[in-house]
Regions:
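Conserved small/polar residues in nucleotide/adenosyl-binding loops
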Residues: 1-5, 184-186
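Interdomain "pre-motor" coupling segment immediately N-terminal to P-loop NTPase/helicase cores
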Residues: 4-21
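N-terminal pre-Walker A segment at the start of P-loop NTPase domains
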Residues: 26-44
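Phosphate-binding P-loop
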Residues: 46-53
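Walker A/P-loop nucleotide-binding motif
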Residues: 54-67
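Post-Walker A helix-loop "phosphate-sensing" segment adjacent to the P-loop in P-loop NTPases
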Residues: 75-87
């Protein structure tokens, strides 16, 4: 197998492992129709923030392109050689709860921390209970300064108490997310 074929096979495998719900690319995102400044879009597209293990949060109402942007960035990261994993917040918490039930939550988090970029979409779509908030904290704390997190949410940070009921843990999550963060209001 030649190098080009192997590289193409690796991309296909990483795309499958990412578990994107639909295929999206940055090329199919209409920057001119969005509120993302072209200079900011270029920075995000460069993936420098992923290489630097920084985080990204895209905040805005439904239908503004948050998911498209996150999936497009994840797809670009895969083509650049990065490992990516996509979750909706509900799917991530459900996965972590299953791990809690069968005592594998630590292994699940360890496996997630082997990827370069973890995409967490629809955060705040449904409220988390205290245990769900603590499970989310474990992932965010494990990724802190080691992996990039990209988050999509309807809610600005000052309203995250609506879906993260345990205030101390919510503040700890935000502290780690905000430390190295590019924030996009869309």
């Amino acid at each position: 197998m030649c190098i080009r074929d192997r590289d193409a096979s690796n991309v296909v495998n990483r795309l499958k492992a990412a578990a994107f719900p639909v295929p999206k690319t940055l090329d199919s995102f209409d920057v001119a129709a969005s509120s993302i400044q072209p200079k900011v879009f270029d920075y995000l597209s460069s993936l420098e923030w992923v290489r630097a293990q920084h985080n990204l949060a895209i905040i805005g109402p439904a239908g503004t392109g948050k998911s498209h942007t996150l999936i497009g960035l994840g797809t670009a990261a895969i083509h650049a050689g990065h490992k990516v994993r996509y979750f909706t917040a509900a799917d991530l918490i459900e996965t972590l709860y299953r791990g809690l039930a069968d005592n594998t939550v630590g292994k699940i988090i360890e496996s997630l921390l082997r990827v370069d970029l973890i995409i967490l979409d629809e955060l705040g779509f449904a409220p988390l209970d205290d245990t769900g908030t603590q499970l989310l904290f474990r992932l965010v704390a494990g990724a802190y300064e080691r992996r990039s997190l990209a988050i999509g949410s309807h809610w600005p940070f000052e309203q995250w108490g609506r879906f993260l009921p345990e205030q101390t843990t919510a503040v700890s999550i935000l502290d780690r997310l905000l430390h190295h963060l590019s924030l996009i209001h869309i």
